[in-house]
């Protein structure tokens, strides 16, 4: 019947979309837990637990894909958050848009904070919340003073302006970034990420940080 055919077509669309949602991030550790060090020179690291993931396309996955994973496979989502924490520890900064197991400057927001923050608020297992918070806080409260590593993608873009004015003004051309003219969008994305960080700070009992983050939202 036409009704049965319509149901079947919807099922195909649904399960195709569900399948496609699992393409990224991709597992990057071997069966023994070994993986290439993030932003490194080929050094091989070893996972103490779980799977190491790379290629976090954080344009919009923090809005839909990772919340979906938090429902369907929370332990896997925890491994992904743990992988981001490891990247931050190995490279010195929580990455903005980690691809090819390295930093990039190709993102106007800082949505690893949103992804990890969502996992913390939902009590997702598999990673250390305090270690994660230390890295998240650094991204939100500090500007990278090293021009070389900043150019490579370490630290938020235009943070001097954002910390001074609570927004990124039009006059700031946001140099050393793939996107240089999205000042309004960048401000809105940072404000969202800082709101998420505020909720994490509140959950972890960091009252001063909670109040400070809300000033940017």
Residue ranges and their predicted role:
Residues 3-8:
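Short, small-residue-biased leader/transition segments that mark boundaries at the very start
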Residues 16-30, 54, 60-77, 117-122, ...:
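Alpha-helical support elements that line or immediately flank enzyme active sites
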Residues 33-46, 75-99:
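Active-site-surrounding "flap" and adjacent substrate/cofactor-binding loops of secreted or lumenal enzymes
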Residues 39-62:
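Short, conserved helix/loop micro-motifs enriched in His/Cys and acidic residues
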Residues 80, 210-213:
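Alpha-helical solenoid repeat scaffolds, predominantly canonical TPR units
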Residues 83-207:
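Active-site cavity-forming subdomains of large catalytic enzyme subunits
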């Amino acid at each position: 019947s036409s009704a049965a055919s319509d149901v079947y077509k919807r099922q195909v669309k649904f399960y195709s979309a569900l399948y496609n949602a699992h393409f990224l991030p991709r597992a990057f550790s071997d069966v023994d837990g070994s993986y290439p060090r993030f932003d490194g020179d080929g050094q091989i690291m070893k996972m103490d637990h779980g799977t190491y993931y790379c290629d976090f396309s954080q344009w919009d996955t923090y809005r839909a894909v990772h919340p979906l994973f938090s429902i369907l496979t929370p332990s896997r989502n925890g491994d992904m958050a743990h992988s981001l924490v490891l990247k931050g520890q190995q490279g010195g900064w929580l990455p903005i848009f980690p691809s090819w197991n390295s930093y990039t400057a190709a993102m106007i927001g800082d949505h690893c904070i949103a992804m990890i923050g969502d996992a913390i608020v939902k009590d997702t297992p598999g990673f250390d919340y305090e270690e994660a918070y230390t890295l998240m806080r650094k991204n939100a409260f500090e500007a990278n003073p090293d021009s070389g590593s900043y150019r490579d993608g370490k630290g938020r873009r235009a943070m001097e302006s954002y910390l001074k004015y609570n927004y990124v003004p039009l006059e700031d051309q946001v140099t050393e970034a793939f996107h240089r003219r999205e000042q309004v969008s960048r401000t809105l994305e940072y404000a969202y990420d800082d709101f998420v960080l505020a909720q994490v700070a509140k959950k972890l009992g960091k009252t001063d940080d909670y109040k400070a983050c809300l000033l940017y939202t």
